[in-house]
């Protein structure tokens, strides 16, 4: 049947079907040949839609909520359609060609893992790919998009590079492809599968079955996540590892450069906020680093470049710590996502800049390459630097710093280095990165799982399992580690005070307790819907009326209740009639506010906003703000909270929660981990597969799902839910965290 479907698609002019059938005809022990280039937009994407920087399909599924906008699903579908492309690969260091003229080496068949039953699964995968119109290299995890860092669409690139994340990421075992193939044979509706995988997500009706099956395959093809080692938990364990390990990989993000004075990018007064005033057509922060937008208007990027150009900043304590590890021969490699070149300033030799840097610039047309000093004058004078060798009337003869833009490739040496380093590393340390951008985000799951892993970051990463979590300002944590390591490391310390450990959460400050005691005690009960818990907030009519008047006069969008409150609330979408029915106000004076119907509706909506925001303001606070100057908090079994940690506490039940919870984490991790023990992930995909196994055990369902024959799938897919990351939170190259 798969052959018939593929032939039908081929007859209809589908090049993907022909590619899939060609893949199915290859010997099973040979790597799949790269597909020929196909021009035009991917499935699920209109011709006018940009193709650069699309998040993975599963991330798109997560971003689409129960009332999922069709645009988000179309973006997820576009990612699914592009998922079979080669993972990023760009010019080798020294070529400086911004993505063309790449070197290609043939890949040997033994580059791939030889799992038992591999040949049978490759044949099944090819048949499934043919049946749904999928192309030939979907089998490998390198097909998953990396938030825009995918292979260029030029023919030259297709001919010249094979380096990709498939060289070093674990390969999924048998399962998802046979599963999809057999469900295709029995005519299963892919929407029923997606409903089980993502129960709160509703795909728009206009998406066809082939696109939906592609999304299913992407979700099920995630590599297995590492599980925490139970024998490594404390900061003492971390210090011992730093003393004993000789081949340490340090993965750094924007957090290591915060203390250097580099301007913030996304804050209210950050770089993007200021650029948006000068360039109102800049749609979002991502566009500044989109290669297509750069070709149309490079001015926003060069205005940004002036603010972080090399030579203006000095390395942080984190940089110096890594440099000393390198000097002592303990550093295997520092993989940095930053573009500020502070690693070189600090003297780190074994450095790999995953997303390029400002160190060099090259022409978009002729690839002429220069040092950063050659274009410094133009950038600081806010003149777009031009290539001296190209004709003056060539509009694209621009000297672009060799930073990896969305829509460009990652350096080929990144993939080659990871292919070697993954088998050599004896300790992984992640500093100042939330690991949201691939393929760098795949590193913790791609090295041997027995290798210890330490996180040093402002917030926890619920989608990954680190052995020791040191949460807070990176320099504060590194300073404490240097004290404990002693010797040359102690000389790096910028703060001579060694911190003391506490194991009980400090009480709320007395000043704040007095403030809370003065709040009106009378409760106001709001039942948002039949399934939501009842909330209790102060009812005093004078307080509420004052806040309502303030919000009405200043516009509800300008009402500042707290920095973190009501982030996900959408009061403009709340039905006024429902608010009136569900708000039980005892004071008649509040009911009489407003004279006209429009005024009542507006004030009712604002009151709803105030009531929703008020509990959040009072309930959540950063635990680190309760710490004294020389303290850090130990939260068993493996979490430490230092100053600057973005870990919050509910005042009522003293439950810790992360600012990232619910936005960039798995569904099982968005509950607040308690003070006693952080919660573990509980995958919804695990429940999905458990249900399928139960079905296959029944006589009437035996063989019906087509999944029971895939033995070994559940172990892999149980850990595959890390696909549900935030679609819209795409970071720029120096903040790929």
From Swiss-Prot:
Entry-annotated residues carrying S-nitrosocysteine: 387, 390
Variant or mutagenesis effect after changing residue 390 to S:
Impairs S-nitrosylation. Abolishes S-nitrosylation
Where does the Deacetylase sirtuin-type domain start and stop, copy by copy?
Answer: 228-488
Give a yes or no for keyword Thylakoid in this entry: no
Kindly list the positions annotated as binding Zn(2+): 363, 366, 387, 390
Quote the annotated effect of residue 683 to A.
Abolishes in vitro phosphorylation by CaMK2
* Annotated spans, Required for interaction with the sumoylated form of CCAR2: 248-251
- Annotated consequence of substituting residue 366 to S: Does not affect S-nitrosylation
Q: What is this protein called?
A: NAD-dependent protein deacetylase sirtuin-1
Instruction: Say which species the protein is native to.
Output: Mus musculus (Mouse)
């Amino acid at each position: 049947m798969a052959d018939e479907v593929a032939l039908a698609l081929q007859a209809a002019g589908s090049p993907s079907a022909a590619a899939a059938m060609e893949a199915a005809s290859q010997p099973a022990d040979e790597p799949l040949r790269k597909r020929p280039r196909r021009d035009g937009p991917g499935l699920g994407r209109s011709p006018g839609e940009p193709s650069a920087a699309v998040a993975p399909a599963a991330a798109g599924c997560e971003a689409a909520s129960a009332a999922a906008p069709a645009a988000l699903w179309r973006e997820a579908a576009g990612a699914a359609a592009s998922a079979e492309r080669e993972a990023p690969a760009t010019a080798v260091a020294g070529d400086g060609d911004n993505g063309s003229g790449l070197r290609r080496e043939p890949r040997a068949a033994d580059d791939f893992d030889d799992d038992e039953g591999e040949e049978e699964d490759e044949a099944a995968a090819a048949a499934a790919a043919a049946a749904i119109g999928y192309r030939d290299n979907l089998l490998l995890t390198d097909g998953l998009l990396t938030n825009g860092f995918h292979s260029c669409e030029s023919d030259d690139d297709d001919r010249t590079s094979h380096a990709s994340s498939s060289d070093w990421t674990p390969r999924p075992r048998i399962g998802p492809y046979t599963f999809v193939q057999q469900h295709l044979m029995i005519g299963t509706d892919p929407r029923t599968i997606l409903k089980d995988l993502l129960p709160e997500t509703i795909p728009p009706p206009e998406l066809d079955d082939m696109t939906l099956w592609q999304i299913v395959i992407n979700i099920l093809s995630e590599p297995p996540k590492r599980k925490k080692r139970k024998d490594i938990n404390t900061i003492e364990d971390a210090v011992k590892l730093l003393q004993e390990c000789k081949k340490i990989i340090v993965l750094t993000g924007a957090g290591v450069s915060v203390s250097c004075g580099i301007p913030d990018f996304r804050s209210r007064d950050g770089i993007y906020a200021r650029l948006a005033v000068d360039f109102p057509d800049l749609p979002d922060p991502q566009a500044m680093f989109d290669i297509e937008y750069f070709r149309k208007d490079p001015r926003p990027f060069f205005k940004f470049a002036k603010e972080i150009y090399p030579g203006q900043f000095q390395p942080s304590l984190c940089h110096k710590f890594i440099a000393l590890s390198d000097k002592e021969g303990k550093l295997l490699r520092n993989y940095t996502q930053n573009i500020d070149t502070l690693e070189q300033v600090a003297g780190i030799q074994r450095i790999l800049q995953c997303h390029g840097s400002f160190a060099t610039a090259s022409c978009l047309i002729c690839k002429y390459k220069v040092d950063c000093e050659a274009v410094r004058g133009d950038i600081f004078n806010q003149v777009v630097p031009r290539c001296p060798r190209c004709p003056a009337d060539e509009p694209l003869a621009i000297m672009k710093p060799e930073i990896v833009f969305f829509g460009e490739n990652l350096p080929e040496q990144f993939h080659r280095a990871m292919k070697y380093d993954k088998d050599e590393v004896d300790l992984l340390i992640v500093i100042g990165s939330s690991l949201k951008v691939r393929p760098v985000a795949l590193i913790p799951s791609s090295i041997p799982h027995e290798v210890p892993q330490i996180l040093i970051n402002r917030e926890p990463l619920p989608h990954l399992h680190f052995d020791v979590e040191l949460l807070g300002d990176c320099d504060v944590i590194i300073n404490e580690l240097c004290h404990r390591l002693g010797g040359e490391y102690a000389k790096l310390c910028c703060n001579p005070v060694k911190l003391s450990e506490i194991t009980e959460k400090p009480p709320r400050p007395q000043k704040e307790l007095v403030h809370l005691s003065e709040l009106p005690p009378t409760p106001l009960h709001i039942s948002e819907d039949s399934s939501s818990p009842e909330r209790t907030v102060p009812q005093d009519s004078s307080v509420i009326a004052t806040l309502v008047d303030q919000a009405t006069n200043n516009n509800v969008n300008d009402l500042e209740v707290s920095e973190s409150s009501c982030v996900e609330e959408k009061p403009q979408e709340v039905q006024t009639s429902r608010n009136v029915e569900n708000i039980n106000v005892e004071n008649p004076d509040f009911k009489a506010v407003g004279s006209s119907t429009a005024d009542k509706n507006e004030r009712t909506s604002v009151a709803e906003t105030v009531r929703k925001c008020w509990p959040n303001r009072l309930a959540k606070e950063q635990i680190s703000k309760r710490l004294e100057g020389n303290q850090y908090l130990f939260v068993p079994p493996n979490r430490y909270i230092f100053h600057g940690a973005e870990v919050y506490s509910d005042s009522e039940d003293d439950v810790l929660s992360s600012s990232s919870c619910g936005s960039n984490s798995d569904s099982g991790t968005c509950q607040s981990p308690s003070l006693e023990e952080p919660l573990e992930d509980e995958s919804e995909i695990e429940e999905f597969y458990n249900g399928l196994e139960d079905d296959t055990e029944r006589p009437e369902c035996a063989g019906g799902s087509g999944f029971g024959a895939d033995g070994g799938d559940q172990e892999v897919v149980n850990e595959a839910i890390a696909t549900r990351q935030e679609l819209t939170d795409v970071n720029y190259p120096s903040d790929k965290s």
